[in-house]
Swiss-Prot record:
Coiled coil: none
Record-listed L-glutamine binding positions: S51, G245, G247, L274, Q277, N315, F318
SUPFAM superfamilies referenced in this protein's UniProt entry, alphabetically: Carbamoyl phosphate synthetase, small subunit N-terminal domain (SSF52021), Class I glutamine amidotransferase-like (SSF52317)
Domain of life: Bacteria
EC category: ligase
NCBIfam families: CPSaseIIsmall, PRK12838.1
Protein's name according to its UniProt entry: Carbamoyl phosphate synthase small chain
Length: 385
């Protein structure tokens, strides 16, 4: 169905709630778990984050698309969301870095999206009832029951191993640092000096994580999620990095086994997001599904040791259960929103992890010092003798 402004679309939730709006992306139907993200900026980074695989993302900021899109802001090689929900799409793109409009970008990448939705009402529903499945479809009366059934039948994130689906299929090297406006190369690329070799386990890694490691003197070998730990160790790394990623960490037994092998070695380990959860599982902790997760760039987190408060970028639907923790796990960070565990370290190993995203992209860089702590551990091992 269309009107003077284009094709009409409808979002149907699994509880039967309907939101009527307009199609702003590719034509068609999509279904996924509906979550909300509270970031004000960074919509292109959000939708290209592999951690959003299997999900339809609601952007709570009311005005989206005003700076267009460009290839430098992509956090991976493709868009990973199953759909997008916004309040209002900007009719123009105004930024000197813009290469194409956001709507064109969505259409070219075959992403179904809907605008003119009361995103505040939708967010309140998700906050009260928890994340639930939804279906975006052309707005026809006969489609309502179809969309409802699709939403009801869609698989929950619980029990889904999505990391192996979004991971790289081959081993590759990465030596590109951060992009600086008006500079063709990062300072480190000009120096051409790398102090450490890091094996990065790709469970859905974001490019800015790789760039921030390179900025600190690391040469990276990125490996698939299911890489045998013997292969990784044969690469003679100075450290192991466990990346972010989508889905439930509990089915990722291959990753848990690999991490347990690494923990037997005197090698520094740093995990982020899904990597944080996998390190916890490998160390004997438990994981639970959250009601609506943490998705946004304004989440306050307390550093336990110093009582310092940092504002962080977050994107996860599962969390480490802080109850019944093994004695060798120390909690280093906690959320000031809901008290959930945000960081941990192993007291008898050179291993630590953080639930949020210290690389931001989008979001604040308050937690970027965690990368510096990783470098400190690498120095401690490599140059102690």
């Amino acid at each position: 169905m269309e009107d003077a402004l284009g094709q009409l679309a409808v979002l149907v939730l699994e509880d039967g709630t309907r939101f009527h709006g307009r199609s702003i992306g590719a034509k068609g139907t999509t279904v996924g778990e509906v979550v909300f993200n509270t970031s004000i900026t960074g919509y292109q980074e959000i939708i290209t984050d592999p951690s959003y695989s299997h999900q339809i993302v609601t952007l709570t900021h009311p005005h989206i698309g005003n700076i267009g899109t460009n290839c430098n802001d992509e956090e991976s090689s493709k868009i990973h969301i199953r759909g997008l929900i916004i309040r209002d799409m900007s009719p123009i793109s105004s930024n000197y870095r813009s290469e194409k409009s956001f709507s064109s970008y969505l259409k070219e990448n075959n992403i179904v999206a809907i605008s003119d939705i009361d995103t505040r009402k939708l967010t309140r529903i998700l906050r009260t009832k928890g994340s639930q499945n939804g279906c975006i479809i052309e707005d026809k009366k006969e489609n309502y029951s179809v969309a409802y059934q699709k939403a009801k039948k869609f698989l929950s994130l619980q029990g889904l191993d999505l990391a192996k689906k979004v991971s790289t299929k081959f081993i590759y090297n990465w030596d590109k640092g951060s992009f600086f406006i008006n500079k063709s190369k990062s300072k480190l690329e000009k120096k051409k000096k790398f102090l450490f070799h890091i094996v990065v386990y790709d469970f859905g890694v974001k490019r800015n994580i790789l760039r921030m490691l390179v900025d600190r003197g690391c040469y990276l070998t990125v490996v698939p999620a299911k890489t045998d730990p013997k292969i990784a160790l044969n690469l003679n790394p100075d450290g192991i990095f466990l990346s972010n990623g989508p889905g439930d960490p509990r089915p990722c037994d291959y990753a848990i086994h690999a991490i347990q092998c690494f923990l037997k070695k005197n090698i520094p380990i740093f995990g982020i997001c899904l990597g944080h959860q996998l390190l916890a599982l490998a160390s004997g902790a438990n994981i639970i599904k959250m009601k609506f997760g943490h998705h946004g760039g304004n989440h306050p987190v307390k550093e336990i040791k110093t009582n310092r408060v940092i504002i962080t970028s977050q994107n996860h639907s599962f969390t480490v259960d802080a109850k019944n923790m093994p004695n060798n796990i120390a909690i280093t960070h906690s959320s000031l929103f809901d008290g959930t565990l945000q960081g941990l370290c192993l007291t008898d190993k050179l291993a630590f992890s953080f639930q949020g995203h210290p690389e931001a992209s989008p979001g604040p860089h308050d937690a970027s010092s965690l990368f510096d702590h990783f470098i400190k551990l690498l120095n401690q091992v490599k140059f102690s003798n």
